[in-house]
């Protein structure tokens, strides 16, 4: 849903590094939504209870211990021949400030109108890419090598560089199961 909302902005502002600093109220809303979702998902990824009062310091320490290479992982946008590293530079010394998109989210959250220029295409793209990357890593942690990663819907925007997918979209998985059941019935006849 967040990816779809971001993609709808591309009807008006082309996804291009030349437009990285283009800001809008829609990007402010998206940055707030993605940031809130990312905050919640960090808790899930780290195994913290939803009611725990955790922050970026807690998330950063856990994630970098669990997946230190996250800072080098590239997110690709093949359709636009673009790539970026949303967690590049993330560190435990300044966890919130070392992620520009997170710092932007916090500043928009606390003073939207004074910081509207931070609500730009680049920060929204990086926040969305960071969420996608963390979700994919979480899926790979909970699925064994014999199980597919099964998100509700495959990303139409992102891919991960040097990532091994065990990916079957839900619709194809059910078709596969139906096909196997039909095949078994056919084999018995």
What spans do the regions from the language model cover?
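Charged alpha-helical initiation segments
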Residues: 1-31
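Amphipathic alpha-helices that form helix-helix packing interfaces
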Residues: 2-9, 30, 37, 41-44, ...
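Active-site-adjacent bridging/hinge elements
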Residues: 5-15, 98-109
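Secondary-structure edge/capping motif, primarily at the C-terminal ends of alpha-helices
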Residues: 9-20, 48, 112, 138, ...
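Short, solvent-exposed segments of well-ordered alpha helices
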Residues: 21-32, 92-99, 118, 122
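Short non-catalytic regulatory patches outside canonical folded cores
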Residues: 38-103, 110-114
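Charge-enriched, short contiguous segments at helix-coil
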Residues: 109-139
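Polyanionic, low-complexity intrinsically disordered segments
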Residues: 139-189
């Amino acid at each position: 849903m967040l990816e779809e909302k971001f993609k709808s902005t591309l009807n008006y502002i082309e996804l291009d590094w030349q437009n990285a600093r283009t800001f809008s109220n829609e990007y402010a809303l998206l940055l707030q939504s993605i940031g809130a979702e990312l905050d919640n998902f960090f808790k899930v990824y780290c195994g913290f209870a939803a009611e725990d009062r955790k922050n970026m310091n807690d998330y950063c320490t856990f994630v970098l211990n669990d997946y230190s290479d996250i800072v080098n992982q590239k997110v690709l946008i093949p359709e636009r021949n673009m790539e970026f590293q949303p967690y590049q530079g993330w560190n435990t010394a300044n966890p919130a400030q070392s992620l520009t998109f997170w710092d932007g989210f916090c500043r928009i959250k606390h003073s939207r109108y004074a910081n509207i220029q931070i609500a730009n295409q680049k920060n929204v793209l990086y926040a969305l890419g960071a969420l996608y990357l963390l979700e994919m890593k979480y899926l790979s942690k909970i699925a064994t090598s014999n199980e597919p990663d099964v998100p509700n819907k495959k990303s139409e925007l992102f891919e991960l560089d040097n990532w091994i997918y065990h990916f079957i979209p839900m619709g194809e998985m059910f078709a596969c199961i139906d096909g196997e059941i039909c095949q078994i019935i056919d084999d018995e006849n």
